[in-house]
């Protein structure tokens, strides 16, 4: 399907029937760009020569939680390796089959492949919301409960895997409502809840509560299967201004250690998240707010 989409883009940007054989001559290529599509010349040429794709991932953390696997640990590492080994092997098999049916990409003639590049881990927060609120891309959940605002109104989004665990505790309806209010008032965290055991608290840690070294480690492990790049975001909780200097020093050292580790393990990082992108509404406290939109790169958003 993706190869069809790519071909549709190429055919709408250039007149391939007139261009004839694959050409490496960019000036000759420019002559056959369709009227009104001049702005797409370079990207169409790249697509025409490489036919690169960017298969990614979505719901990594959601799957771990559904299987009761903490994000931090060797079980998550094992699934991470298994999942991306599978994706890469199937993608490689598919591009070879397409090459035999439709031909190779010109820039990699003789490789037996239809596409020069296959995988790229892009952010897809919007798609995650559409797909039943699953976790975006390879990222951990920012909160277990938050208010999602749309043009048609606001509604509360709850972590469905946490909801299942809470319902198994035998709570009454009013008690369950109070627990969710408590979670909302704690910025989506469950670490303070006595009703959950230590393992359950580990499973439902939010992005800012995780040791960021594990995000880097998972990304490092899967990089061998990703021929392009990963959008790797890191999440940090700034200490309050009233905290002692030692706390601030430890925070800065932690941030430095994570980035130093990332520099040695990864070829790039994406966003440095120091505050929640989607603020959790504390229904018990009325606080004046300024609406600050969380900006994403539209070009690479899934």
Identify the meaning behind each predicted range.
Residues 1-44, 48, 64-124, 197-203, ...:
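Internal maturation/activation junctions in enzymes
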Residues 48-58, 74, 78, 82, ...:
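Conserved active-site and cofactor/substrate-binding residues in soluble primary-metabolism enzymes
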Residues 54-59, 103, 137, 188:
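Glycine-centered small-residue hotspots that permit tight backbone geometry or close packing
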Residues 290-302:
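Short acidic, low-complexity intrinsically disordered linear motifs used
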Residues 41, 54-56, 70-72, 122, ...:
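Generic, ordered loop/turn and secondary-structure boundary motif
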Residues 2-29, 33-34, 119-288, 301:
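Catalytic alpha/beta core of large soluble enzyme barrels
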Residues 51-66, 116, 129:
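Contiguous, well-ordered alpha-helical segments that form the cores/surfaces of helical PPI scaffolds
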């Amino acid at each position: 399907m993706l190869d069809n989409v790519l071909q549709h883009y190429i055919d709408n940007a250039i007149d391939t029937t007139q261009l004839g054989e694959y050409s490496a001559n960019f000036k000759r290529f420019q002559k056959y760009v369709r009227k009104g599509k001049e702005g797409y010349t370079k990207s169409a040429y790249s697509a025409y020569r490489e036919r690169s794709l960017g298969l990614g991932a979505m719901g990594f953390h959601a799957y771990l939680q559904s299987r009761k696997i903490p994000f931090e640990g060797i079980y998550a590492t094992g699934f991470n390796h298994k999942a991306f080994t599978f994706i890469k092997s199937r993608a490689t098999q598919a591009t070879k089959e397409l090459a035999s049916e439709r031909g190779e990409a010109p820039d990699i003639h003789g490789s037996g492949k239809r596409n020069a590049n296959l995988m790229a881990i892009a952010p897809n927060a919007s798609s995650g919301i559409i797909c039943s609120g699953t976790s975006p891309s390879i990222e951990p959940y920012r909160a277990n409960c938050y208010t999602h605002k749309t043009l048609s109104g606001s509604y509360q989004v709850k972590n469905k895997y946490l909801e299942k665990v809470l319902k198994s505790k035998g709570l009454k309806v009013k008690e369950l409502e109070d627990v969710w209010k408590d979670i909302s008032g704690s910025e989506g965290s469950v670490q303070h809840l006595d009703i959950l055991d230590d393992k359950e608290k580990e499973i439902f840690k939010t992005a800012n509560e995780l040791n960021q070294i594990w995000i880097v480690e998972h990304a490092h492990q899967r990089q061998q299967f990703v021929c392009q790049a990963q959008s790797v975001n890191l999440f940090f909780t700034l200490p309050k201004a009233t905290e002692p200097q030692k706390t601030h020093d430890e925070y800065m050292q932690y941030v430095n250690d994570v980035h130093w580790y990332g520099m040695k393990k990864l070829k790039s990082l994406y966003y440095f998240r120091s505050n929640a992108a989607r603020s959790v509404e504390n229904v018990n406290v009325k606080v004046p707010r300024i609406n600050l939109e969380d900006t994403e790169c539209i070009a690479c958003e899934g």
